[in-house]
């Protein structure tokens, strides 16, 4: 049910469908619909000059709810219908990226329209229930690892972009960037991609070429946004210069590529795969924070808070 309330009635756990009025902070007019999870975001929204807020009481708390205002979010709705809807969105997006990869492998260009549609589905799934989305995308069979990984990274980048308060257009491009960050792997032999044990030095050199391959594939489309190409080419760069393909460091790496690096590694180590056990979110984030020089430390700390707020408390 949609309901119009004043900004002073806002509480954490409400699902915001729209912000009405002439805003001093224009980012709220460009944001996706979102679940209000964080005190700072709520404070900024109350100071934005909004005349009223449209909330969806079916997806979050109602005004005057007896729920404690200190709660970060409502408990995830784990009913079969919700799980089925999120699973369908993930599979649909995975199918879309699989078709895109096949087209790229055959020499075709990437359709931005198709990727935008897939990103919209991912965004809806993430915003409706991030915990279920993260849970569904952790499960990856051998045949679909690359595709579901792409969907998962896309969703994590959307989730984190919204947490950071980025505008809607930027968050949309983050989602597309996540979907396409590994497209260069279509040029890598499947025997290397699907190898369960460690890669030898020669195989590692080959797989390290995939960012450059991806940049070239994406550049076939003259309308491809620079951010998408940047993320594809630089998501394996590291803050200390120890990454690849160019050994960029610090300020040479864009915010968007830094976000992608965090989301890419987080999904990789927390995923359920046939040949390894997944790490818990806490173990993954602890390990990542200890990797001195790999990630943007301040950004990673914010990502940890974002994930903590998105997953149910044990």
Task: Give residue spans per PLM region.
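Divalent-cation-assisted or electrostatically stabilized phosphate/pyrophosphate-binding catalytic cores
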Residues: 45, 195-217, 238-314
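Short acidic/histidine-centered micro-motifs embedded in hydrophobic/aromatic stretches
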Residues: 118, 139, 174-177, 210, ...
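Acidic/His-rich, divalent-metal-binding segments that scaffold phosphate/diphosphate chemistry
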Residues: 73-208, 215-222, 226-227
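A glycine-rich, aromatic-flanked flexible loop/lid motif
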Residues: 179-186, 227-236, 255-260, 275-277
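Helix-turn-helix-type domain boundary/helix-start signal
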Residues: 34-35, 164, 197, 222, ...
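Membrane-cytosol interface segments
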Residues: 1-110
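Signal for well-folded cores of large energy- and translation-related assemblies
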Residues: 46, 127-131, 158, 184, ...
